[in-house]
Amino acid sequence: MPRHVLTLNDLGEEGSWLLVQQARGIPDAKGRTDFMTERTAVLLFAQDSFAERLCVSAAVRQMGGSIVFQGATGGWKSEVERYQRQMLAVIDYFVDCMYVYGIPGLATKVDRDLVQFPIINAGSPDARPAHVLADVACMLRYTRDDLKKARVGWLGCTNGTLFSLIEGLRYFPFSLQVALPPLEDRPTLETYARHCGVKVDFVDTPQQAVEGCNFVYAGCRSGLDEEMSQQWKVDDALLAHAAPKARVLLGTSPMQAIEVASDILASPASLLLLQSENRLRVHKRLLHWVFLENERAI
């Protein structure tokens, strides 16, 4: 059966740790191999994301593969949802794997019995597994491989990265405290944390979210008006509540994230570039993971 990575649950604890360590072990993130030679990946993006398209395309092409991209236009999403059996059979005829971006509930919408090729979730509103694996690699670097020392604070609106962070607590021993803006759906996240069987500290203010944290996430700002955006931003005053030398991660693209002061983004405190590098590493290892178990000779 094909292997899929729609959420971290598809990898499990052993697979999640393995991919993080393998990704960290790649000598050069942009190094070129021939692993994907004669393989084609189709990218189905229901929403635009230049950053995700760039990262996934680079991973496939630097490994010798080919890309077919389809953006949000064209009506493919409703066609695939309505005629899943027929469309998946057609896609299987032409490509070797699929990346999907921007489809909510992807893990439950895909009928795995119908899919004869690997599917990787490049990001959805309720899961971004590759992002969290890459960010765990960042945390390991700055905790000297001891995630029990990682205290993570999230401020901002909900997105797939936050859902995967909560899911990641099943497998990785960091702690997580979360502050959501007033109009966000906190009960849904609390229910999800209970479903995952993990402990998340939900607090009320950005200051409480970063209190004592050595990793601070600037989450999504999609639900914030201009006045609220000024109250929910990462600046020196906010980081004064965090641990000394706290590192700042972005939970989404810079244009969609809670505002981070420009001097912080340009400082060693910002892990934006390391996050990007590690995502490239993780996507390369994900391709190895989904394909190797599918090779009959292995």
What does each of the following model-derived ranges do?
Residues 115-117, 174, 241-247:
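A short helix->loop->beta-strand "cap" motif at the edges of active sites that frequently abuts
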